[in-house]
Curated annotation (Swiss-Prot):
The gene is cysD. It catalyses: sulfate + ATP + H(+) = adenosine 5'-phosphosulfate + diphosphate. With CysN forms the ATP sulfurylase (ATPS) that catalyzes the adenylation of sulfate producing adenosine 5'-phosphosulfate (APS) and diphosphate, the first enzymatic step in sulfur assimilation pathway. APS synthesis involves the formation of a high-energy phosphoric-sulfuric acid anhydride bond driven by GTP hydrolysis by CysN coupled to ATP hydrolysis by CysD. Belongs to the PAPS reductase family. CysD subfamily. This is Sulfate adenylyltransferase subunit 2. PANTHER family: SULFATE ADENYLYLTRANSFERASE SUBUNIT 2. One of its GO terms (biological process) is sulfate assimilation. Heterodimer composed of CysD, the smaller subunit, and CysN. It comes from Mesorhizobium japonicum (strain LMG 29417 / CECT 9101 / MAFF 303099). Its EC number is 2.7.7.4. InterPro entries: PAPS_reduct_dom, Rossmann-like_a/b/a_fold, SO4_adenylTrfase_ssu, Sulfate_adenylyltrnsfr_sub2. Keywords: ATP-binding, Nucleotide-binding, Nucleotidyltransferase, Transferase. Residues 279-301 are annotated as: Disordered. CDD domains: Sulfate_adenylyltransferase_2. It comes from the Bacteria.
Length: 301
């Protein structure tokens, strides 16, 4: 008897297959846990893939020290609730040099506190495969990246040297020092993510739900004043608006959207009519043309 799977069931099955393939083929995998909605879905799928056992790999959070406070609280809450092995890495050199998004700009801050920090962590622990929650519908450089994305010993991605992935057969062979970035959510869309979160009742950071929040209008974006480190420019004022976030990152570099969607059902309804990418809320994507591909070539996820 043939069982017809729904769209979400097919995506779920593909992602679970990818998790198990990596666990079987690599010596020391890790899952990057950014605490956002995609990471929450990824974590849920990882738990399903190996149930009733726990995932056979740790979860790594690269802390830039500028994440939303609610993200950090949620991260610690989920680690305690689910009991997974959580590793937190901070680029202490960047902290010592006081690298921050206000004084050094988004490009330098992202490179030092995210890209370099990630490379440090992967080298420190010797991970040979790293799961991430990137999706092809997010951004053009991610659209052309393979599910199993090869990186050389310097963590560099070469888009002209990607491995074929015909018939869902993945090449897992690597030499010493090389690694693979793995994206089980490659074929998911933002709408798929939200419909799956609703279907599975997956916990997410409250910042995704609309609420009155103190924001500053800057460079066409609504920036949440999350703590006293937020430096106001001349003429700027903080005002409370009903906003939520479609994407999460470092709070000075992440724009909110005006919305009254305060339930999962309302968010799904909003996504059904959305005509813009969630990445429009990321200041780091505005650094320069092709900025995401440049960052990925340097080792960014």
């Amino acid at each position: 008897m043939t069982i017809a799977l729904t769209h979400l069931q097919r995506l779920e099955a593909e992602s679970i297959h990818i998790f198990r393939e990596v666990a079987a083929a690599f010596a020391k995998p890790v899952m990057l846990y950014s605490v956002g909605k995609d990471s929450s879905v990824l974590m849920h799928l990882a738990m399903k893939a190996f149930y009733p056992a726990k995932p056979p790999f740790p979860f790594l959070h690269v802390d830039t020290t500028w994440k939303f406070r609610e993200m950090i609280a949620f991260r610690d809450q989920m680690a305690q609730k689910l009991g997974f092995d959580l590793l937190v890495h901070v680029n202490e050199d960047g902290v010592r040099d006081n690298i921050n998004p206000f004084d050094h700009g988004s490009n330098t801050h992202t490179h030092v506190m995210k890209t370099v920090a990630l490379r440090q962590a992967l080298d420190k622990y010797g991970f040979d495969a790293a799961f991430g929650g990137a999706r092809r519908d997010e951004e053009k450089s991610r659209a052309k990246e393979r599910i199993f994305s090869f990186r050389n010993a310097q963590h560099v991605w070469d888009p002209k040297n990607q491995r074929p992935e015909m018939w869902k057969i993945f090449n897992t062979r690597i030499a010493s020092g090389e690694s693979i970035r793995v994206f089980p959510l490659s074929n998911w869309t933002e709408l798929d993510i939200w419909q799956y979160i609703l279907q599975e009742n997956i916990p997410i950071v409250p910042l995704y739900f609309a609420k009155e929040r103190p924001v500053v209008e800057r460079d066409g974006m609504l920036i949440l004043k999350d703590d006293d480190r937020m430096k106001l420019r001349p003429g700027e004022t903080v005002e409370n608006r009903l906003v939520r976030f479609r994407t999460l990152g470092c709070y000075p570099l992440t724009g909110a959207i005006e919305s009254d969607a305060d339930t999962l059902e309302a968010i799904v309804g909003e996504m059904l009519t959305a005509r813009t990418s969630e990445r429009q809320g990321r200041l780091i994507d505005r650094d320069e043309a092709g900025s995401m591909e440049k960052k990925k070539r340097e080792g960014y996820f």
